[in-house]
């Protein structure tokens, strides 16, 4: 009996080692660019931006950059400003890294910090905490003589 054909497709996989290395290379370079270059935008003036992760496409031509503004305030405005200056940042990135193609940059707000804070608050809820604490075993199943 024949196995069902997957029509030449492999099952979905995570990023390759090449993508992971390129993502880290781009992340480190962007951190240096943010530290050294002045971006003329009133929204970005005086704002420190943390680059938390960079995900690179399999062909290394596109990079999604996850950022978190220090303090988490005005995150949407900061992300919009970074996307407006993506070409400027890509130009500096091309001079800072050695890849065949400099990836196009798309900036997104990293929601993982907010999600972690929400989960921590949820676990501190007394109703949830009572379900998380171990209960002493019940002796009701034992026969009493």
UniProtKB/Swiss-Prot annotation:
It is found in: Cytoplasm. GO terms for biological process: maturation of SSU-rRNA. GO terms for cellular component: cytosol. It comes from the Bacteria. GO terms for molecular function: ribosomal small subunit binding. InterPro entries: KH_dom-like_a/b, RbfA, RbfA_dom_sf, Ribosome-bd_factorA_CS. The keyword Cytoplasm applies. Residues 1-10 have a biased composition (Basic residues). The keyword Cytoplasm applies. Residues 1-21, 124-145 are annotated as: Disordered. Keywords: Cytoplasm, Ribosome biogenesis. It holds the Pfam family RBFA. One of several proteins that assist in the late maturation steps of the functional core of the 30S ribosomal subunit. Associates with free 30S ribosomal subunits (but not with 30S subunits that are part of 70S ribosomes or polysomes). Required for efficient processing of 16S rRNA. May interact with the 5'-terminal helix region of 16S rRNA. Belongs to the RbfA family. NCBIfam families: PRK00521.2-5, rbfA. Monomer. Binds 30S ribosomal subunits, but not 50S ribosomal subunits or 70S ribosomes. This is Ribosome-binding factor A.
């Amino acid at each position: 009996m024949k196995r069902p054909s997957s029509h030449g497709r492999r099952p979905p996989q995570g990023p390759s080692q090449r993508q992971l290395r390129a993502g880290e290379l781009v992340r480190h370079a962007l951190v240096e660019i943010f530290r050294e270059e002045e971006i003329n935008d009133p929204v970005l003036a005086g704002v420190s931006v943390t680059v938390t992760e960079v995900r690179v496409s399999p062909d290394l031509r596109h990079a999604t950059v996850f950022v978190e503004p220090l303090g988490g305030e005005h995150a949407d405005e900061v992300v919009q400003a970074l996307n407006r200056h993506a070409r400027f940042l890509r130009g500096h990135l091309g001079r800072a890294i050695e890849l065949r193609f400099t990836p196009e940059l798309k900036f997104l707000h990293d929601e993982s910090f907010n999600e972690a804070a929400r989960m921590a608050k949820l676990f501190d809820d007394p109703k949830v905490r009572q379900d998380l604490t171990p209960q002493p075993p019940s002796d009701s199943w034992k026969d009493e003589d």
